[in-house]
Regions:
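N-terminal Rossmann NAD(P)H-binding glycine-rich loop of SDR-like oxidoreductase domains
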Residues: 26-47
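NAD(P)H-binding glycine-rich loop region in Rossmannoid oxidoreductase-like domains
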Residues: 73-120, 149
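Glycine-rich NAD(P)-binding loop of the Rossmann-fold in SDR/ketoreductase-type enzymes
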Residues: 113-124, 173-174, 233
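Conserved Rossmann-fold NAD(P)-dependent oxidoreductase catalytic core, especially the SDR/UDP-sugar
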Residues: 123-170
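NAD(P)-dependent short-chain dehydrogenase/reductase
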Residues: 152-153, 184-231, 235
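Active-site Tyr-X1-5-Lys
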Residues: 166-195
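Glycine/proline-rich active-site loop of Rossmann-fold NAD(P)-dependent oxidoreductases
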Residues: 176, 190-192, 203-213, 244-255, ...
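Mid/C-terminal beta-alpha module of Rossmann-like enzyme folds, strongest
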Residues: 239-301, 314, 334, 343, ...
Length: 390
C-alpha cells in the first residue's frame, strides 16, 4: 500500500445485496485509520471494478491496517483543511464515503473539539464535494443514535420518524447536524446521489464496541424495572451495507440493523454474566463501584441505550436498498461471545434448568434433578471469592 501526502495525490459481502450496476471509478473514504473505515477501504480495494481507492485520515493507520488495505492509497489529511479539496479534485474522485464521525471527545480535547472535528469537518468536506464537478455520490455513515432513547419510543423507528425528545449526547446531535448538511448539499447539487446509513450499535469478534464491552463485565449493572430492547448489527454486515451503498445507485436514508431484538437481561445471561439491578439514581455511582473506571467512559446517550434500547424498522433497507444482513441480532451477540472466549461466570445450561424449575414450582409441580445442581454453574476456577455453586 502506498502512503501519499495531499500534494502527491492529483464483494464478497457478509450480507446479501442486489447490485444496481453503478460501480464507481475513484472512491475516497474518510476515517481510514479506524476500524470501520479501514476495513471498508480493504473491501473496496479488493473490487477489481474500482480503479482507485483513496483512504484519508488525520492520523496514519497502524502498519497492520496499512497492509490490509492492499492497493489503496493513504493520504494523511484533515478534512477541515482546504487541502482535502486538492485531493478530491486532483484524483477526480466520483464517490465519497464519510465515516470519520467521532463518538466521543478525543482524550486531549473537549466537547467543543469533538464538535469542531465532526460538524465543521463534515461541512468542509461536503462543500468540497459540492464544488467538485466529478463527484457523483456521497455516502454517510450515520447511526441509530439520532433517534434517541426514551420510554415514549415506538417499538420500531422508521426513517421518517425523529427522536421523541432531544438526544442528550453530543454524538447524536452532531450526527443530526451532519445529516442535515448533507441533505442541503444534495438539494444544491441534485446530480449528486446522497446515501445516509443509520447503523444500529455494532458488535463483532474483532471490535470492542459499546454493547460488547458492557455485557463483558463480570457483573453488569442494570436499572430496576427496565429491560432494554437491543437491536444490533454485526460488524461484517455493517461493512457489507456500506459497500453496497458505495457500489450501487441507491440513494436516501436507511436504517441498517439485524433481524430481531435481544433483551438486555437475555444478552447478559447469554454472555454468562451476572445482572445486578439498581435504582436509576445509583446507576452510575454504584455501577462504577461494580465494574470500575470503565463505567465513567460511557456517554449519556450510551447509558440511555442500556436503559431503554432502540428498535429499527428495516423494511426500506430490504426493499429499496436490496440489502439483507447475514447475522440476526442473537447470532451477532453469540458470535461475539464465542469469539472473545469470555469466561462464563454462570453457565447457560444451569440458568435454563433454574428457569424450568421455577416455572414448575409456580405451576405447583416442583422438579427435582438429582446431581444437576452442581453441574455447569461456574466455568471459572474457584478462587475462594465466596461464589457458591448453586
Amino acid at each position: 500500500m502506498a502512503e501519499k501526502t495531499a500534494d502527491e495525490t492529483k464483494s464478497n459481502s457478509a450480507g446479501e445485496t442486489k447490485s444496481n450496476g453503478s460501480v464507481p471509478r475513484v472512491v475516497l473514504v474518510t476515517g481510514a485509520s479506524r476500524f470501520l473505515g479501514g476495513y471498508l477501504v480493504r473491501r473496496l480495494a479488493q473490487n477489481p471494478d474500482i480503479e482507485r481507492v483513496i483512504a484519508v485520515d488525520s492520523v496514519s493507520p497502524s502498519k497492520d491496517m496499512l497492509r490490509r488495505m492492499g492497493r489503496a492509497e493513504f493520504v494523511r489529511a484533515d478534512i477541515r483543511n482546504p487541502l482535502i479539496g486538492k485531493v478530491v479534485r486532483g484524483a477526480e474522485v466520483d464517490t465519497v464515503v464519510h465515516a470519520s464521525t467521532l463518538q466521543r471527545a478525543p482524550k486531549s480535547g473537549s466537547r467543543a473539539a469533538m464538535k469542531d472535528m465532526n460538524v465543521i469537518g463534515a461541512m468542509q468536506l461536503f462543500a468540497v464535494c459540492q464544488k467538485a464537478p466529478t463527484v457523483r455520490k456521497v455516502v454517510l455513515r450515520s447511526a441509530s443514535v439520532v433517534y434517541g432513547c426514551s420510554a415514549k419510543d415506538p417499538v420500531k423507528f422508521t426513517e421518517e420518524m425523529s427522536a421523541r425528545r432531544r438526544p442528550p449526547g453530543g454524538y447524536a446531535r452532531d450526527s443530526l447536524e451532519i445529516e442535515g448538511y448533507l441533505r442541503g448539499m444534495g438539494r444544491r447539487r441534485p446530480d449528486i446521489s446522497v446515501g445516509i446509513l443509520r447503523l444500529a450499535p455494532l458488535i463483532g469478534p474483532q471490535l470492542t464496541a459499546t454493547v460488547g464491552h458492557y455485557v463483558s463485565a463480570p457483573v453488569v449493572p442494570t436499572i430496576v424495572g427496565r429491560d432494554a430492547r437491543l437491536q444490533l448489527l454485526h460488524v461484517e454486515d455493517a461493512l457489507a451495507a456500506l459497500e453496497c451503498a458505495t457500489v450501487s445507485s441507491v440513494a436516501g436514508t436507511y436504517n441498517i440493523a439485524a433481524d430481531g431484538v435481544v433483551m438486555m437481561s437475555q444478552a447478559i445471561r447469554r454472555a454468562g454474566r451476572i445482572q445486578v439491578p439498581m435504582p436509576l439514581a445509583l446507576f452510575r455511582s454504584a455501577g462504577s463501584a461494580l465494574v470500575g473506571s470503565s463505567m465513567r467512559l460511557y456517554t449519556d446517550e450510551q447509558l440511555e441505550y442500556f436503559r431503554f434500547g432502540c428498535g429499527l424498522d428495516t423494511t426500506r433497507m430490504r426493499t429499496e436498498m436490496g440489502f439483507s444482513p447475514r447475522w440476526t441480532t442473537m447470532q451477532a451477540l453469540d458470535d461475539f461471545v464465542r469469539a472473545t472466549q469470555t469466561r462464563r461466570i454462570i453457565g447457560s445450561s444451569w440458568i435454563d434448568r433454574a428457569e424450568q424449575t421455577l416455572t414448575a414450582i409456580v405451576g405447583g409441580n416442583a422438579v427435582s434433578s438429582p446431581g444437576s445442581q452442581n453441574a455447569d454453574v461456574l466455568s471459572m476456577p474457584d478462587t475462594g471469592s465466596g461464589v457458591v455453586e448453586r
